[in-house]
Amino acid sequence: MSKTAVPPRVGVVMGSDSDWPKICAVGAALDEFGVPWEARVMSAHRTPDAVREYARGAADRGLKVLIAAAGGAAHLAAAVAAHTTLPVVGIPVPTPDLGGLDSLLSTVQMPGDVPVASVAVGMGGPRNAGLFAVQILATSDPALEQQLRAFKRQLQDQVAGSNQALNEALRGAGSGGTAQQ
């Protein structure tokens, strides 16, 4: 969790503490942008009352975005979304039996009128969940928006550098191929 005295703006909930190593990139992404956050373990199936109370009280505590990670019968994001008006991002956690397909389908197959934004299963998903929360917050935070713009420029520069390095490698290998700009 962010080590600041500032109240958290993002809440991260997971179905089990064993999910944390698989989703810790969400916290790293939030920390990268200086967004304070909190994390909790709660289960849609084992502690439904705790999930309901957490989701219902989140906005009153100053949270602006909720991120819910679960594997298997991954109903945590849905349970959270049912009890809040805040944006909810679901992270489908990979599972040993089906590689996370079960988690993905449970997270994305929401009924109408109960929206949950979902990210990918695997390594990119948790980071994207954190970045998506940052983008949501940036809609009302000009300083955070500027950080995001700088981040996007940095990504563009990295790709341009990779393209240039590829062109140089192709020329050095005597290849007739080129990597287009």
How does the language model describe each region?
Residues 19-23, 48-51, 70-79, 98-101, ...:
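Short glycine/serine/threonine-rich phosphate/pyrophosphate-binding segments
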Residues 2, 8, 21, 37-39, ...:
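Acidic, glycine/proline-rich low-complexity segments that act as flexible tails and inter-domain linkers
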Residues 137-181:
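Glycine-rich phosphate/pyrophosphate-binding loop and the adjoining helix
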Residues 96-146:
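Short, glycine-/small-residue-rich phosphate/pyrophosphate-handling segment
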